[in-house]
Amino acid sequence: MSTEFEQAVAALHGEGVIAYATEAVFGLGCDPDSELAVQRLLAIKQRPVEKGLILIAADLVQLQDYIDLSQLSGEQLARVEASWPGPFTWIMPARATTPTWLTGQFDTLAVRVTAHPQVQALCRAFGKPLVSTSANLTGEEPARRVTDIGELLASKLAYILPGEVGGQANPSEIKDARTGAVIRPS
């Protein structure tokens, strides 16, 4: 593991918020199991907890502690799995044990299995998914390069992992896993 990855993982274990490249934009991430880390991320983003968050993972196995796959039919799960890894976020039933700092006011959770090699490696090195949201203040344009991360935002982060965004022009499409309805087009 590179020193950069070690620093990013250490920041995550220290309940910090990091920035890292995803398929389309730089993301802000933290430990989904740390309420303190999530509250820090929400404060940086100026985002209300009620809106809920997205988890990004290296594979479906990393998400199984947070989502209730038993509430999906075989066909629904097959549709989700056919889109991954990739820039597709699915709203899925949350487990009863999934904290409200992740789900917000919902009984569901937005999840994605990334195709971005650096994010896959980061999730594997950390051993679980990350909370993932775009690296910007709510309402502003998301960062597409490290240099786009403003000084104000950068000063609030525990670490910025150098990297390149993937080839996606827009943030991930969000769909409801049970209905197939598009919540946010790509």
From Swiss-Prot:
Record has Nucleotidyltransferase as a keyword: yes
Gene Ontology CC annotations of this record: cytoplasm
Domain YrdC-like: 2-186
Family in the record: Belongs to the SUA5 family. TsaC subfamily.
HAMAP family, A to Z: TsaC
Function statement: Required for the formation of a threonylcarbamoyl group on adenosine at position 37 (t(6)A37) in tRNAs that read codons beginning with adenine. Catalyzes the conversion of L-threonine, HCO(3)(-)/CO(2) and ATP to give threonylcarbamoyl-AMP (TC-AMP) as the acyladenylate intermediate, with the release of diphosphate.
Protein name: Threonylcarbamoyl-AMP synthase
Organism (species): Aeromonas salmonicida (strain A449)
Name of the gene this protein is made from: tsaC
